[in-house]
């Protein structure tokens, strides 16, 4: 058996079987924009976590990019979804694409019920962000229409994640 050849054949077959469902140009543009926005927030969050962890003897924050398959299979979020998560001691924050030109940030925290029993709370929305492309890049706004700075958003999210 030629392992590499077999794997390549699997990939070719997958491409042939999924070629019929090509997205429209508008959908493709929307996907490109949300990918760019997620990358902006992923990079800023990664930078913030790196700076935070440098200040500690043992870094306690981590970040993970979430694949579409993970979001579908394990988190039961269907459709073409993008996201990443920030994991802190006792807290979990996930950044997800929402409707077109929107992303949502959800948080969960661990609750202790004594006797070593820990349960995560229901996810709560920390912020919903809308965005639009401009000549200078992207403009981010909250649900009231106020402009947002991505670094300030990430700073507040990290503060929430490390709070007791």
Predicted segments with their positions:
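Generic alpha-helical secondary structure signal
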Residues: 5, 32, 151-152
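Acidic, low-complexity proline/glycine-rich segments
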Residues: 1-17
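Contiguous, amphipathic alpha-helical segments that mediate oligomerization or scaffolding
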Residues: 12-67
């Amino acid at each position: 058996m030629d392992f590499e050849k077999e794997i390549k054949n699997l990939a070719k077959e997958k491409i042939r079987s999924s070629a019929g469902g090509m997205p429209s140009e508008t959908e493709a543009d929307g996907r490109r924009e949300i990918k760019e926005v997620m990358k902006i927030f992923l990079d800023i969050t990664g930078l913030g976590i790196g700076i935070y962890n440098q200040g500690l003897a043992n870094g306690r924050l981590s970040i993970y990019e979430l694949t579409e398959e993970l979001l579908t299979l394990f988190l039961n979020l269907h459709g073409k979804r993008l996201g990443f998560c920030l994991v802190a001691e006792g807290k979990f924050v996930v950044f997800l694409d929402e409707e077109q030109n929107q992303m949502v940030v959800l948080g969960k925290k661990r609750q202790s019920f004594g006797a070593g029993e820990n349960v995560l709370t229901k996810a709560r929305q920390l912020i919903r962000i809308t965005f639009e492309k401009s000549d200078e890049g992207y403009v981010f706004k909250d649900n009231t229409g106020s402009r947002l700075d991505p670094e300030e958003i990430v700073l507040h999210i990290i503060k929430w994640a490390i709070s007791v």
